[in-house]
Amino acid sequence: MGEPIKNRYEFVVLFDVENGNPNGDPDAGNMPRIDPESGLGLVTDVCLKRKIRNYVEMVKEDSKGYEIYIKEDVPLNRSDRKAYESIGIEETDDKKIKEAVKKLKKTDPDVDIKLRDYMCDNFYDIRTFGAVMTTFVKAALNCGQVRGPVQIGFARSIDPIISQEVTTVSYTHLRAHETLRHL
């Protein structure tokens, strides 16, 4: 898997978007995010991390140590199950998981740390960006917080952007098609 990142690095990434919307704002009808004072386009850190996650998932294709924890439209507890299985808990019901963890903690008080280590060893995005392991709290576990070495801020465009809506025309009936053709 390679050495973990040990030093701090600062870098700039330039990317080009032409006739597109790199990060629509759901609160504004999915229009591009724009700084109202400067007119510069914005791309959130969440969007940039999603692009990195998608790239790693595509390139590494489930290689050991490169799974993605925060996936689009996939509940986190699906990945949590893999962590539970790594410590010998096969249960799927939350109540039974909690009971199994309680029983396991009597013989292994470091179960919280083992789960956290499993998550870091297997999930690229947790190891890279960090995570707050709150999904394990319902099983009476305290896996804490992982601080990732890679921190990403908002991206800003170099030049102001102009947001334009593009309208399309479609017809649903043959009569409408004939009318449009003769205009």
Give residue ranges: language-model regions.
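An N-terminal structural lobe/cap that precedes and organizes the functional/catalytic core
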Residues: 2-82
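A generic structural micro-feature
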Residues: 5, 144, 174-175
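Generic structural motif
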Residues: 18-20, 155-157, 179
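Conserved small/polar residues in nucleotide/adenosyl-binding loops
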Residues: 172-182
